[in-house]
Swiss-Prot record:
Biased composition (Basic and acidic residues): 138-149
Skewed-composition ranges (Polar residues): 113-126
GO cellular component, one term: viral nucleocapsid
Organism: Simian retrovirus SRV-1
Protein name, as recorded: Gag polyprotein
Proregion residues excised on maturation: 101-162
InterPro entries tied to this protein: B_retro_matrix (IPR003322), B_retro_matrix_sf (IPR038124), Gag_p24_C (IPR045345), Primate_lentivir_Gag_pol-like (IPR050195), Retrov_capsid_C (IPR008916), Retrov_capsid_N (IPR008919), Retrovr_matrix (IPR010999), Znf_CCHC (IPR001878)
Keyword Transmembrane assigned: no
Amino acid sequence: MGQELSQHERYVEQLKQALKTRGVKVKYADLLKFFDFVKDTCPWFPQEGTIDIKRWRRVGDCFQDYYNTFGPEKVPVTAFSYWNLIKELIDKKEVNPQVMAAVAQTEEILKTSSHTELTTKPSQNPDLDLISLDSDDEGAKGSSLKDKNLSCTKKPKRFPVLLTAQTSADPEDPNPSEVDWDGLEDEAAKYHNPDWPPFLTRPPPYNKATPSAPTVMAVVNPKEELKEKIAQLEEQIKLEELHQALISKLQKLKTGNETVTSPETAGGFSRTPHWPGQHIPKGKCCASREKEEQTPKDIFPVTETVDGQGQAWRHHNGFDFTVIKELKTAASQYGATAPYTLAIVESVADNWLTPTDWNTLVRAVLSGGDHLLWKSEFFENCRETAKRNQQAGNGWDFDMLTGSGNYSSTDAQMQYDPGLFAQIQAAATKAWRKLPVKGDPGASLTGVKQGPDEPFADFVHRLITTAGRIFGSAEAGVDYVKQLAYENANPACQAAIRPYRKKTDLTGYIRLCSDIGPSYQQGLAMAAAFSGQTVKDFLNNKNKEKGGCCFKCGRKGHFAKNCHEHIHNNSETKAPGLCPRCKRGKHWANECKSKTDSQGNPLPPHQGNGLRGQPQAPKQAYGAVSFVPANKNNPFQSLPEPPQEVQDWTSVPPPTQY
């Protein structure tokens, strides 16, 4: 053993020097730990006695398999780094003489240590494992040579020994010199590959004098072991489910609601008489198992279970807190009549809820005032329903609908017929929809008006919602809503609806105004500003016909010169006959220009204005007095005519023509 330690230490020292020549500094203790790890993961490596690139790469494959199997926490940090450094040394051993000498000495040490381990170790401890795949802890994977010199105690191994029981006197054991070492490499590599089938035959012994070893056990395949664990877990889950079902059944027996038939039918199955489209509720027996998969609509108060004998049992469960929490959050954030809140209410109301359940749910979700409003509307709806039931003669009175009087207990309400549950649902949801919106200043339809930039569809939605609260249903006042949809719309939407107002319905209004948005409003405001009008006046005057009326026919659209009626009337007038004035042509008398008649007698001039020419200045002034004195120095008196005397006024009439 001491000789082995000295040779091993000398080899490690030479390897350290060889690495140092390549500029790599390593610690002596780290190299010792590395080769201890090599011996633990590759027990076949020291026994071959040859170091070449092929075997060293096989060592690297063993490292990788060990890493994939046990994880990084079982592999030293420097294992792969040292493996790469030694691989480079082996690749270049022909170039560096020092490296070649170190490799040769290492091969000699491996051969010597291989034969020494086979002859000495079994004599010292016959129960010592020869080939070990892994240990329980990282420090016990394979002790170094120094640790073996100090302590030879046996360490527990996780995997069994890969040897079969044999005797030293077996005549079939071959000579170590005749062993095919290359073939053994492939067989030993199979020990670490989980994809290979279990190796059940023993490998050829390296030494004929090897004592007997424990019996070989096959290496457990990790996949098979994992499948066994999964099967065990599945069986455990099934047993736990059956255990929970039996506990639930026992609790129901104590309350006197059900009878037990057998473990197979202990859970029973949920059956609820339902109409088409109704969600079938689930029983409480599976609540603990499906708690993580439940949604608010999967937990309902009243359910009906049928046992193995075909007998139906009804039982009542309390509301799940997730339902109340979700509905409370929706009512607080979005409002009691918001679409999301109503969707949750309808989802819960699709199943069997007693009047007490409705009262509990509303009191927990809504405020005090809203709860009272809902309760008053609910009672009013129940009175109307009770009157119809009385006329139909089905016996479902007001006390049954409201859960009062003889039907105030939960046990009595659980026995209701499915049709009665449907009437309670309709009355409760109708009362919920009539709850007022917070911040709404009264439910007045005339006060609902479209904003300047509000889409027309949103405005109609607000109008229909308000009408539904007032009339109970928007269909009841659809004509009134249509009228207000036009009158309370903004000017742009009114202008778009006006030509088709009496030709389409409310959906047509929405389609006509679908393209009217902020950009349209902005362009319309700019056009009205440029024309100096308001938006409303601009839209009202935009389609009016331009131009005045015709002065001849009084109609719009043309002028008098283009009047077709005047031209048509002129074409129908009679032709003039013989002129009564001159008796010489066919023309009208007012158009006659003759001076004499057909006999040659002079004709008097036309009376009246007639056709007058340009007025002319008189050639002689009558009755005018010259106030300009006669003076030779007057520049305006240039003619050598004698001055006129003052004339008196005369009675001569003015000339007829100028």
